[in-house]
Amino acid sequence: MARDLTYINKLLLRYGIYVYDKDMGNMLTLMEMEIKELYSHGLISKEEYIEAFLILKRRKEG
């Protein structure tokens, strides 16, 4: 299991999505939105979705 934003970046890049914002809070929010969209369209598995959200949650809290 991945434990950092690199996992999420690689996951998003598989679908040609690159997220960058100089404000980390905004960037995490944008990543969250993109992950939700990928999952809602059935492009990523439930496990990938959960893993990504746990990483984002930990990053937002810490």
For each feature predicted by the language model, list its residue ranges.
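Short, charge-rich amphipathic interface segments used for partner binding and complex assembly
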Residues: N26-G62
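N-terminal acidic leader/helix
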Residues: M1-G25
